[in-house]
Amino acid sequence: MENLEKKIELLKKIREFLILNLEIKKLMQELNVDSDIYEAYEKVTKIVREPNIKLYRQYYDAIKEMFYEEYGKKRKDISWYPKIDYNRCKNCEKCISFCPRGVYDAENGKVVVKYPYSCIVNCNACSIMCCENNAIIFPDEKIPRRN
């Protein structure tokens, strides 16, 4: 049980990192921070994020089978994950570098949703970081929690 609790705590910390990272990037854009500084920040966050992406990939199959008490379903039975509108996608790969869960990857020169069930249920933060064409699409409604 202790190992599961550690994994849950790690997931919570990664979610906090995701939100903080999004806020920092938005602030840097609003302040017109020099592109060299922004690129350096991107490199640092990638280094910090990389071990967690590997962890999620190792446990991907287990994640699909995890029971989400708050939704009353296994993850594989919850239809919440991104889709890419390739008519809008510029292959800028911002989603790949942004997502701490490693949902996206590049294959044959285009961005793909490689690990859809690694996506945090009801999270759509990557669609905010996406290029201005809104190429990342999520379900219209959030998944309701059980009472």
UniProtKB/Swiss-Prot annotation:
Its cofactor is [4Fe-4S] cluster. [4Fe-4S] cluster 2 binds at residues 119, 123, 126, 130. Keywords: 4Fe-4S, Electron transport, Iron, Iron-sulfur, Metal-binding, Repeat, Transport. This is Uncharacterized ferredoxin MJ0251. [4Fe-4S] cluster 1 binds at residues 89, 92, 95, 99. Residues 80-109, 110-141 form the 4Fe-4S ferredoxin-type domain. One of its GO terms (molecular function) is 4 iron, 4 sulfur cluster binding. Binds 2 [4Fe-4S] clusters.
